[in-house]
Amino acid sequence: MSYRDLRECIDLERGTEDVGLAAGRSQREKKRSYKDLLREEEEIAEQVRKSSKKRSKELDLFSGNELHKKKKKHSSDDYHADHSTDSAKKKKKTSLPSPSSSDTAMDLLKAITSPQADTSTTHPSKKPEKILATPISFSSPSQPPHKDYHKKSGEVSGDDSSHRSKKSKPLTLREPDGLRMKLIMSPNEKSEEEAVSPQGGPGHSDSASSKKNSKKLGREEIESRSSHKKHKKQSYTPRSGGTPDSASSTGGELDAGELVIDDSLRDMKKKKKSKKSKKKKDKHKDEKHKKHSKSKREHEVEQSQTQIASPGLPSPPPPPATTPPTSPPSIPLQPQALVTHTEEQSDKKKKKEDPEKPKKKNMSAYQVFSKEYRVSIIAEHPGIDFGELSKKLAEVWKQLPEKDKLVWKQKAQYLQHKQNKAEATTVKRKSSSSESAPKSKGSSSGLVSPNKKSPTSSVASFSTSPAKVPDTEPIDVAAHLQLLGESLSLIGHRLQETEGMVAVSGSLSVLLDSILCALGPLVCLTSHVPQLNACPKQILSNTLDNIAYVMPGL
């Protein structure tokens, strides 16, 4: 082979390689353009989502003009979308699966954009309209941020005119709180819409509807916010025989229509009524319970009174038939009312007296000593201060021998015992007097005759007060003897504990003191025997008081 032949072969091979490279480059460029288109569509979709979220938060009355401008641009882009065949074919491939569906979609698009579409559209053409809405939304890169807004305007322009001409049924909006609203169209608005739809072309009708929608959307949302702040989601019922009404289509009819409320918040009123009825029932139950408890108490008091009266006295005989039946029951009711009233008063007095009672204080030997010795110090030093007096008393108490301190201790114990005994006797007297009072009342109620002669006798029995009891009663004597026994037992325990011999003089003095402490109370018992009552009561009471100084072992 010559050099030329080799050069030609190499050139041919290079040419084929260049052709292959060019074909590969064209395919890559096609793929890149396809990918770029997909990316652009995704970016537009993201922009639509973001703007829809922002719009739902920041929509106000001033946003109507901006929406109107965007809608104008959008309608002009849709009107010229048929001329750009290359871009439409590529996007139909991405959105529509088969060529037959793309042909039908193009036919329907032409039918919608033509001025005769308002009368020719029927119910079977609903599904392809929904399919068409997706490719049209991606046709222009300068699309406004609402996909759904374009769908709603397209559907309303086709369907609303035919349905309003056929049927004038009111639109119904179903709110979540049970508030059902009817939108009745006024005749002026119907005539205006019928006049606008055939005269203006598709661009004019779209712009008019977009103006109404943009202005009245703001009003609708302000009303919905003021009426339902708590509920964010709103569910609307579809129209009979047509496509479901969107927020934009219904918002355009709120201004001209009359609003009729069917169910005005019945659920809220029912809840409030149920709460009020529950409160009333609870109050009624409490009042019944209180009345029932009061009646029970009164019944128990009456039963106790009848039981007290029945054992003491025989039951009165039944009244004869000739006597009138009204007079006997009125007589025994009076003492029962008196008893209940007195019992209530006594309960109140007890409640008042309980906090007023001072606590009992035990008398100490130093207190008894200071009480008696204070008089002598004041007599010696008139006008002495309380602080100096207390200091002198403390010094004298310290200088006292133990025997004298024991004597003062015994005296304090005796006085304490006497005080306790006096309180016990007063309590017994009160209880006995309180027991005797209902008995006398019961007897008086049992003995009451129709002539009413017994009240004077019952008053006389109440007026007699018990005589003042002297200090030399058998109870006092028994208390002194009990103290003597306790002191002697203490001395015996101490003698058992001590080791060694005990002085005879000490034992004799203890025995003599114990004899005196035993004989003194026994002499007081002679006052209760008339044959032996020779000593005056004052001397006997003084001896009982002085026994405390002689009591051994305390």
Curated annotation (Swiss-Prot):
SMART domains registered for this protein in UniProt: HMG
Entry's localization field: Nucleus
Polar residues bias locations: 113-123, 236-251
CDD domains reported in the protein's UniProt record: HMG-box_HMGXB4
Gene3D superfamilies: High mobility group box domain
Domain of life: Eukaryota
Gene Ontology BP terms: negative regulation of Wnt signaling pathway; Wnt signaling pathway
Known DNA-binding region: 359-427
GO molecular function terms noted in the UniProt entry: DNA binding; protein kinase binding
KW Nucleus (keyword) present: yes
UniProt cross-references to PANTHER family, sorted A to Z: HMG DOMAIN-CONTAINING PROTEIN 4
Protein's job: Negatively regulates Wnt/beta-catenin signaling during development.
Entry protein name: HMG box-containing protein 4
Gene: hmgxb4
